[in-house]
């Protein structure tokens, strides 16, 4: 999603609104992910793309997050390119722009960088993570089945456990975005067999 690329942004916005309306109609949760993209011959490593990435991520959340139940956001900046203070400011702006609970995607960055991104995002208001490649991409570098199994069992499992511990300690509860407290949720009772109507 590129808010300044009006033709594609308008089409994507209309699609997001339509899909969210259908999900509400059928009582389905919608997770929406928007990613910044290079255009006009850029690559994701070009300064022109990197210069606008944070603003694209923040503005995308402002525009799109109302059309979902959970918003999946990119990290608004680049570790080592912007200062920690700038990245923290970007994350606070992302949090303020998102109308829904948001989680951080990994975009395939190296695990150590993702761990730093997760820490910063959780302290800025993220409710959790929805990462993939940062946890397991080295799996494909293993030369045999035993190596792949060992990687998943030892390395990937530990990574997931470490990030899970971070989320449990520092994540913002999703329900606070909707104005609820833990006490409010504690009063909710579901009728036995409620799920059969689905």
For each predicted feature, which ranges?
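Catalytic-face loop-and-helix region of soluble metabolic enzyme cores
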Residues: 75-179
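Alpha/beta enzyme core
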Residues: 3-21, 25-29, 37-100, 116-127
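Charge-rich, low-complexity amphipathic helices
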Residues: 45, 136, 143-144, 185-189
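C-terminal extensions of enzymes
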Residues: 170-198
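Conserved, mostly hydrophobic/aromatic
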Residues: 33, 71, 132
């Amino acid at each position: 999603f590129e808010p300044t690329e009006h033709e594609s942004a308008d089409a994507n916005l209309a699609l997001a609104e339509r899909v969210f309306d259908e999900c509400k109609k059928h009582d389905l949760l919608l997770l929406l992910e928007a990613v910044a993209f290079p255009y006009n011959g850029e690559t994701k490593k070009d300064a022109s793309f990197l210069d606008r990435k944070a603003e694209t991520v923040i503005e995308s959340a402002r525009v799109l997050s109302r059309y979902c139940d959970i918003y999946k956001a990119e990290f608004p900046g680049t570790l080592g390119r912007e200062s920690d203070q700038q990245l923290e400011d970007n994350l606070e702006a992302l949090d303020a722009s998102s109308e829904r609970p948001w989680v951080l995607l990994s975009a395939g960055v190296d695990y150590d960088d993702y761990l730093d991104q997760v820490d910063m995002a959780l302290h800025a208001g993220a409710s959790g993570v929805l990462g993939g490649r940062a946890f397991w991409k080295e799996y494909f570098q293993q030369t045999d089945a035993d190596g792949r199994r060992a990687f998943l069992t030892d390395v990937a499992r530990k990574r997931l456990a470490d990030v899970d511990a971070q989320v449990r300690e520092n994540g913002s509860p999703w329900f606070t975005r909707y104005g609820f407290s833990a006490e409010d949720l504690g009063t909710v009772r579901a009728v036995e067999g409620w799920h059969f109507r689905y």
